[in-house]
Structures are given as C-alpha cells and as structure tokens.
Amino acid sequence: MKVPAFSTVLLAFTFDLRDETGSLLLPLTAAQILWINLITDGLPALALVFDRTPGVMHQPPRPAASPLLDRSSVRFITATGSMKAGLALGLLGLMPRLGYDVDVARATTFHFMAVGQLLLTYPCRHTWMRPLPNRYLHLAVIVGVGIQLAAAWLPVSAKLLGNAGIPIVAWGVVFGSALLAWGLAEVLSRLAWRADARVSSATDRTTERTP
C-alpha cells in the first residue's frame, strides 16, 4: 500500500493540485492512509498464509547474495503503484467535473484506494508460479470491502477519517475504477513475469552452451 499512497500524494504535490479556494489539495489525509494500511495489510496478509503453490517446495534455495526483491517484483510494484496513483488522481480531477464538490472527490479517491488495494491482492500473488484458489483470501477481501463500506456509512468512523458521504453514482465510480485497476494489474503481472522468464531462459541457454 505504501507505494500507491506515496505516489498519489507525491503526484498531487508535483502537479500542484488545488481546490476552489486555492489551497493545496491533498488526495488523502494521514488518518485515511493509516486506515487503508490497516484493512489492506491485515486480513489479506493473514489469508495469504493459506496460499497453496504447487511445486514450491521442490524449488532450489535462492543464492544468499540475491536481493529480497528480484527485478520482476520491482517492476510490478513500481508499475502497479504508479498506475493506481494515476487512477486516484484521475478520480480527484474527474469528480469535480461531474459536479461534485472537493470533499466528495477526496472521499471517492479514499474509497477507491482502499477497495482497489484489496482487489490488487490477487495479482500480487502471481509470480512465475500460479497459486491455487484461496477461499480464505476471498473471504478476507469480502470482509475488507464490508468494513470499508461500514467506515463510509457509520457517522463515528466517517468523522474520525474526515470522510464525506458519497452518492450511489460515486460508489459506481469507486468499484468500476477498482475493477479497472485489478485488470490492469493482472496484465502488468503477466508482462513482468513473462519478461523475467525470457531472461532466465536466455541465461539457461547461454550456460548450457558454455564449455
């Protein structure tokens, strides 16, 4: 979650986004960022413990000097973080053009960041191996979305998060954008790991030809 949130705020500063009063427009407040981290790093992380990846125990150990994140992982994290930040800023600029005020635009962006990150748990599982379906992850995502909806509708949580109520149309934008982010992340995942597979295959062929 850190990369999309950081990228969103950074891009907002870079493009000098401002509201109708001329004040700097922050896409997310500190409380909202903490909340997103809480619901997206909690239940989904626990559910991923139950992931089943066929053949993973037959893989040789990684070299001791290998980095924690390989090139494919770095490419995927950077690409998806930038993509999600771009969509978030797009919502922040789109909603006022549709006639909604800045508070609704910021709330729409907040809900998209939360719901979108929950859905991005699925492409984040995909590496050069494809895990088997995980019903615990499905449950974690459903519960996470439910908690996000409750946070939007309960007056206490809405006040604590500085979150304005949004109409049904805006919820359609939230879920539509989240599904779009999911689909784009799936494509980026396949491209990242396919490129890594080509490099590994070329390296193996070179090694085989070396006397």
In which residue ranges do the predicted regions lie?
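Membrane-embedded transport module
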Residues: M1-W128, W153
